[in-house]
Regions:
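Intrinsically disordered, low-complexity boundary segments flanking structured domains
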Residues: 131-134, 251-254, 516-517, 598, ...
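Alpha-helical transmembrane segments of integral membrane proteins
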Residues: 287-586
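C-terminal domain-closing interface element
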Residues: 139-158, 281-302
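Soluble extramembrane regions of membrane proteins in the secretory/endomembrane system
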Residues: 1-274, 637-642, 647-649, 653-689
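A generic short-segment signal for beta-strand/edge and adjacent turn/coil regions
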Residues: 82-86, 112-116, 177-181, 495-500, ...
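General structural signal for secondary-structure boundaries
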Residues: 1-3, 105, 136-137, 273-280, ...
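Juxtamembrane/start-of-transmembrane alpha-helix segments at the extracytoplasmic/lumenal side
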Residues: 267-286, 346-355
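Extracytosolic and intramembrane catalytic regions of membrane-associated proteins
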Residues: 23-49, 53-61, 93-94, 174, ...
Length: 736
């Protein structure tokens, strides 16, 4: 019920719907007989390109009986303008409301519990930043549990932790039902530019865990992130984690949470999550390598392999792994060439079937290659060749990327044990053959439970974009190499049959993928339409992004303009952004990926800027401007150009940090202000030189204006907005 009330309509920060949802959350928390703390403040980040917002965070605090600090449960209650945000992050808010109710109904916790609903996460984590930097409760936090979503289904993944996570990971693995997550995602996330509110909380230097479910990621930040599409099992899994972990950390000494990082991974078919200290990673890798050497020496003494044959096979297998990664890198592009029906980040429609085709193609190549190699090498040489790559990878990851070491270590152990069980010619006592075959199949468990689920996870998380395609290709090749002994068992002398069967399956997957006839309500096209008005020139344009973000600009664009867009753009739209959208430092109006056409001019309120003062300063002047939004716009932008700013204050708050060192002719400065006061904002800039200052003020509001005398067909279900959604943009320029 919480999700249905929260996610009826989009609620971006600063919107009327956002305020309605906020008031409803205050009432829901108040119904628990808890006093609600409201943090209303302004916050800003950046120097040359500043983001700012008026935010209103909501929080409650349950006092502990013998507190050693506070446990913080966090989720954000705003969402993007394009969709209602049932999963992102209505699910997190609902989780916290129910967890608070359950915990309050039970025995009192020893530690304090803070429940924080942040504002303006989608605009740059500004609500979380305001809490961390400005609220007095922040200094009490010792443990953070953050709940997010990047899809509408799937298990709640624990995808990020704080440093020194051994204790908190152990509690997660032992308490949460069907734990899902691994230290691999922790290592990957540390190297990505992605952020959630948890990124701000980590600045507190506290322990923490970050959760999100990611299934059906294509619904993320679109109208399809709706209550009807939200998997209740995902919501329940998130809620289970919140309650058990809040209770556990609420009873622990929060001063004793720091420890060495852990290597951890979940086994999805088993429902457990093994974990051990990173200190053990290198000794385990060395031990696995030693087991490999022992097995190889035994095989050599039995004349079951040779050094020369194994070296040649190592080269062949390493080339195969690299080729599989390259094929995966190009797979999304190749699929796009077949029908050019693109999704963001280089993904394509029917991506699941194309991913299955990719895996099948790599499997077919490996099985065919295996059959060819068996004409020259015996099974042991091929197995040890693949395992040698695992040895090198296990040692390297255990030293450089410790959290990823389990991906290669445990399949290596299983592969070595399988190779030791394999005997040339299968000359064994009667009755021993089936037992050995069973043992060999059992040793496939590490690869089956670790490597192959990662192939699926990568696709679910990132689709078939180039980077994820490459990862899928490499993981598939590694998974096949780890099972080379099992391949020998399955083939049983019929070496070409596995390749033939894999080829048939691959062809079937490709046939299903290419039958996609077009965008539909099940697989919609993602298009944002903007009405862009230049208040100075009294002109207006329609503009639409025609190639999704991350898609190669030289790829074909099937069916453009879309039939629905033709009523706005006509049959011969221009390429590029309208002038009113071009910032002083951005590319020219020929920017690819956009289509534009003239639009009827509608009388719309325009944002305003005025010069409050201009006084001499050493080497230049100090200018104070007043920028005022047009009305109830979502974002007020101020773009300044013409003189380099060396010091800036917004509403009396000096921007923290040094202005970046830039080229002398780089004079651009910008502010994007979410939920700006209707009375306006004051900007003071200390400038180098006294050259005229060009100032553009831009007001962005959700939705499109009514056009007198024109009626447009509504969006079909096969064409939907994403992220910022449809917008009305009004720009006015000044020279001061």
């Amino acid at each position: 019920a919480h999700v249905e009330r929260i996610a009826t309509r989009p609620r971006p920060a600063g919107s009327a719907q956002h305020d309605l949802v906020r008031d409803g959350l205050v009432a829901a928390l108040g119904a628990l007989s808890l006093p609600v703390e409201r943090q209303v403040t302004t916050v800003q980040q950046g120097t040359a390109a500043v983001r700012a917002a008026r935010v209103e965070n909501l929080m409650v605090r349950l006092k502990g009986t013998a507190s050693t600090g506070a446990v913080l449960l966090a989720a954000h209650y705003d969402c993007v303008p394009a969709g209602p945000g049932a999963a992102d992050d209505g699910s997190g808010v609902a989780t916290l409301l129910e967890a608070t109710r359950a915990i309050k109904a039970g025995p009192a916790l020893s530690n304090d519990l803070i429940v924080l609903l942040t504002d303006a996460e989608e605009f740059g984590l500004l609500g979380a930043q305001a809490f961390v930097e400005q609220h007095p409760w922040a200094k009490d936090v010792r443990m953070v549990l953050d709940f997010e979503a990047r899809g509408t289904s799937g298990p709640s993944q624990m995808f990020e932790t704080s440093a020194g996570n051994g204790v908190v990971v152990s509690e997660w693995a032992s308490l949460v039902p069907r734990p899902s997550g691994s230290s691999l995602t922790y290592e990957v996330y540390k190297r990505l530019p992605n952020d959630t509110d948890f990124s701000m909380f980590k600045k507190l230097g506290t322990a923490g865990l970050n959760f999100a479910f990611i299934g059906n990621w294509e619904r993320y930040h679109t109208p399809r992130d709706s209550p009807g599409n939200l998997d209740r099992g995902s919501l329940q899994h998130e809620g289970d984690a919140a309650v058990v972990l809040a209770r556990r950390f609420g009873a622990m000494d929060l001063g004793a949470l720091q420890s060495r990082d852990a290597v951890y991974f979940s086994l999805p078919l088993v429902g457990v999550a093994p974990r051990y200290s990173t200190v053990l990673a290198l000794p385990l890798a060395v031990g696995a390598a030693g087991l490999f050497v022992l097995a190889f020496v035994i095989a050599r003494r039995r004349r079951e392999t040779s050094i020369g044959g194994t070296v040649l096979a190592v080269i062949v297998y390493a080339v195969f792994v690299a080729a599989a990664g390259l094929l995966g890198w190009r797979s999304g592009r190749l699929a796009g060439l077949l029908h050019a029906r693109w999704l963001p980040e280089g993904n394509v429609l029917m991506g699941g079937w194309y991913a299955a085709t990719l895996v099948g193609a790599i499997a077919t190549l490996w099985l065919a290659l295996y059959a060819l190699l068996r004409k020259k090498f015996n099974a042991h040489s091929i197995a040890f060749a693949a395992l040698f790559v695992f040895v090198a990878g296990a040692l390297a990851t255990s030293w450089f990327v410790v959290g990823a070491s389990f991906v290669l270590q445990w399949p290596l152990v299983g592969g070595v044990l399988a190779a030791m069980a394999l005997r040339a010619g299968w000359e064994v006592p009667p009755g021993a053959g089936p037992l050995r075959a069973f043992i060999i199949c059992l040793t496939a468990a590490p690869a089956a439970l670790i490597v192959w689920p990662l192939v699926s996870l990568v696709f679910v998380a990132m689709g078939l974009a180039p980077e994820s395609g490459a990862a899928i290709g490499v993981l598939t090749a590694l998974g096949l190499g780890a099972l080379s002994v099992q391949t020998e068992v399955i083939a049983q002398g019929r070496r070409w049959w596995p390749a033939v069967i894999a080829a048939i399956g691959t062809a079937a997957c490709l046939a299903v993928a290419v039958t996609e006839t077009g965008y539909s309500s099940r697989d919609p096209r993602l298009v944002n339409l903007l009405y862009v008005a230049d208040a100075d020139a009294r002109t207006a344009q329609w503009t639409a992004q025609t190639i999704p973000r991350g898609v190669p600009q030289d790829r074909p664009r099937a069916g453009w303009p879309d039939p629905w867009l033709r009523q706005y753009l006509g049959d011969a739209p221009r390429t590029g952004r309208p002038d009113a959208l071009v910032q002083p430092w951005s590319a020219a109006t020929g920017t690819p990926g956009f289509l534009s056409a003239d639009a009827p001019v509608v009388e719309l309120p325009a944002p305003q800027a005025s010069l409050v003062s201009s006084t001499p300063a050493e080497g230049g002047r100090t200018v104070t401007l007043r920028a005022t939004p047009a009305g109830d716009g979502h974002v007020l932008s101020v773009w300044v150009n013409g003189a380099r700013a060396i010091d800036v204050s917004i509403d009396g708050k000096r921007i923290a940090g040094q202005m970046p060192a830039r080229a002398a002719n780089d004079t651009a400065w910008s502010l994007d202000y979410v939920n700006a006061p209707a009375s306006g904002t004051t900007i003071t800039l200390t400038l180098v030189g006294v050259t005229p200052l060009t100032v553009a003020v831009v007001d962005r509001s959700a939705g499109l204006p009514e056009i007198p005398g024109r009626t447009f067909a509504p969006r079909p279900a096969s064409v939907i907005p994403i992220q910022a959604g449809d917008q009305t943009v009004v720009r006015r320029s000044y020279v001061f």
